[in-house]
Amino acid sequence: MRITFAQGLKKFKGPPGQTRIIDVREKDEFQEGHLPQAELYPLTSLVQSVQDGAFEKDQVLLVYCRSGARSGQACDYLRSQGYQQAYNIGGVLDYKDEFGPLEK
């Protein structure tokens, strides 16, 4: 399911640890700039991260990438693994237009 950054950040504010912001870009992209409080889990290693127990199934996962394509793939995979609260919030291009510069 795709929602906007604003919807995701507003709707899913909950207890610490309940909502996580997941960046599925590669490390070099993340280092160039990322969302506040984002955690890096590249799409290329997402299967291993899930197998290693990186996420809890009751957590809200707000997933993004550069444009929304990789985050869409990541959400499809996460949902297929039982993470029903995985949401594609698009890409950093959308974020910068709406909220301004990224963190480094």
Segments and roles (model prediction):
Residues 64:
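Short, surface-exposed ligand- or partner-binding patches at beta-edge/loop junctions that are enriched
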